[in-house]
A protein has these predicted regions:
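Tandem repeat scaffolds
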Residues: 1-20, 28-138
């Protein structure tokens, strides 16, 4: 599920993936782009990651760790997010329309101008989150 082993690169604050001593960004055997292109992200660990204008539409994000990350202009349209950790993240102008979000931790995160129209959000932790100018209708 979650790896609590730090990346082998001494200056990196991220956690190592479950199949490596490195985080996904520093693993010499992996390129981040092909990994993010898969329709399923399972046990990904990208803490303290800066994600700008990526398209995660229709993906399944399972058991992954993205805490302390920044997401700007990211599309999560029709995405299924299960049992994942987005604690203390910043979400700006992200779209989660028609997504299924279950057993996810968003505690301490900030959401600004995000859309969650017609999304199903259950058993999810938003404790301490700041939600500003977002649309959660439907």
């Amino acid at each position: 599920m979650y790896s609590f082993t730090r990346c082998k690169v001494s200056s990196c604050p991220r956690y190592a993936t479950h199949i490596s001593e490195y985080c996904l960004a520093h693993d010499p055997r992996q390129d981040l782009a092909p990994t993010l292109s898969f329709p399923v992200l399972d046990s990904a660990s990208l803490s303290n990651w800066n994600c700008t204008e990526e398209d995660f539409s229709g993906k399944r994000i399972l058991g992954s760790l993205f805490s302390y990350s920044t997401f700007h202009g990211v599309s999560f349209v029709k995405t299924t997010i299960l049992n994942s950790n987005f604690s203390f993240c910043l979400f700006e102008e992200c779209v989660f329309d028609e997504s299924t979000i279950r057993y996810v931790i968003f505690s301490g995160s900030t959401f600004t101008q995000c859309m969650f129209m017609n999304s199903s959000i259950t058993h999810t932790n938003f404790n301490g989150s700041i939600i500003t100018r977002c649309d959660l209708t439907g």
